[in-house]
Amino acid sequence: MAEENHTMKNEFILTGFTDHPELKTLLFVVFFAIYLITVVGNISLVALIFTHRRLHTPMYIFLGNLALVDSCCACAITPKMLENFFSENKRISLYECAVQFYFLCTVETADCFLLAAMAYDRYVAICNPLQYHIMMSKKLCIQMTTGAFIAGNLHSMIHVGLVFRLVFCGSNHINHFYCDILPLYRLSCVDPYINELVLFIFSGSVQVFTIGSVLISYLYILLTIFKMKSKEGRAKAFSTCASHFLSVSLFYGSLFFMYVRPNLLEEGDKDIPAAILFTIVVPLLNPFIYSLRNREVISVLRKILMKK
């Protein structure tokens, strides 16, 4: 009996979205289609950038890594979610929870820094085009990309490590479609104040620094666009920036709501819509927002299709 109770403390049940059979089938089809489009779209973009020397520039190196991160995000969350739609055993161990959150936190943190790097790259290209190759060298690009993944790993290690200081002795039902860290805090029998404080400080710092970099870069870009004499060039540049900024706003807005709001352990029912945005919707939209509006990518795709 003691062993069974101990097991219960370290296993959780993901309640997911709904228990209605009709809705389960519909949601499964929708999320499976989104998953396929997300993975195929992002991996295709990575392959396209990797195999064509014409795209081996800082802008596309960042874009390729962003696509890789988005596909990893989908793979970390969606398979288990799809399995749970029809599985009677929706259990997940504490260690599986830790692994799932580790990968999610790593890729989302890397995503933040990559978006900041991409915004800086566009700032240099539009505001200082003559100095682009000096200010945005391949060496700096590689350093920024590597730094994004190192920061992601360190950030996730801190939070995952602190999870193991908690004790779970009450309910083991997680009202979520994946094992996020906030529901674990709510189930803890030990006061998670330290975990909550560390999450607020580190997540807040990452997001404030990266969104600040993005906003400053886009502010300078907009000022430069408004100074353009060509109305056509101004409209094209503004249209591209607007679509990029929409993706950034959805991503950062949902992350801020999830992890940087006051009283993190309250309002658990509102976590799921925000989580859907940054784990499912944004990875789906990014390859289309960043590539289908890009002349270089479209040009390479046309050449490939013409050869076939």
Curated annotation (Swiss-Prot):
Pfam families noted in UniProt: 7tm_4
Family statement: Belongs to the G-protein coupled receptor 1 family.
Swiss-Prot/TrEMBL keywords: Cell membrane, Disulfide bond, G-protein coupled receptor, Glycoprotein, Membrane, Olfaction, Receptor, Sensory transduction, Transducer, Transmembrane, Transmembrane helix
Gene Ontology MF annotations: G protein-coupled receptor activity; odorant binding; olfactory receptor activity
Magnesium as UniProt keyword: no
InterPro entries with a match to the protein in the record: GPCR_Rhodpsn, GPCR_Rhodpsn_7TM, Olfact_rcpt
Native source organism of the sequence: Homo sapiens
Protein name in the entry: Olfactory receptor 5K1
Positions on the Extracellular side per record topology: 1-25, 76-99, 161-196, 259-271
Glycosylation sites: N5
SS bonds (residue pairs): C97-C189
Superkingdom of origin organism: Eukaryota
Subcellular location(s) per record: Cell membrane
Its biological purpose: Odorant receptor.
Positions in the Cytoplasmic compartment: 47-54, 121-139, 218-237, 293-308
A GO CC annotation given for this chain: plasma membrane
Gene3D superfamilies: Rhodopsin 7-helix transmembrane proteins
Transmembrane regions listed in the UniProt entry: 26-46, 55-75, 100-120, 140-160, 197-217, 238-258, 272-292
Topology with respect to the bilayer: Multi-pass membrane protein
